[in-house]
Amino acid sequence: MSKIEEAKKKASETAVEDWLQLSVAFDGADEVDESLTLIKGGGGCLLQEKIVASSAANFIVLVDERKCSKKLGTQWTKGLPIEVVPMAVKPVQIRIKEVLGGDPLLRPAGTKMGPQLTDNGNFLLDWHFDPQANYDWRKVEDTLLHMPGVVETGLFIGMTRKVYVGNLDGSTRVLGE
């Protein structure tokens, strides 16, 4: 076993209790709206990122100004990431279209054949929704999470109280408290 494989094995065996009480966690986001609701998961690691964010007393987000929007879906146009167990992809796609509309597309792997796998071995759907519609994101998330086969969504609602924004001119600003 290589050193990298050993490190990965050790990290995967680390008990959540060992790091469950983080005082602060920092991360980026794919998009943040005016109410500090985030879309994350563009890189495919949304479940584990949500576990870390929810385990931190303070979850602080860092973005550049191009990721800020009045409404979700206007800057990040690649869809809302949804982690789904492989056998449920088709039923979940059909259900999303029936209940929420839009177009939930299976995310392809970038450098190999087939769909992209999450770190947990699941597939990702990218739900392309109407960015002009007025969504209650808590209801959307609840609807998605109650679909059999959906593991997690890329919606991070009420998880951060502060977003640090780097502006293109080099200045910074803080959204939130």
Predicted segments with their positions:
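Glycine-rich helix-loop-beta junction characteristic of Rossmann-like nucleotide cofactor-binding loops
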Residues: 15-20
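Conserved phosphate- and dinucleotide-binding cores of soluble alpha/beta proteins
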Residues: 2-10, 22-177
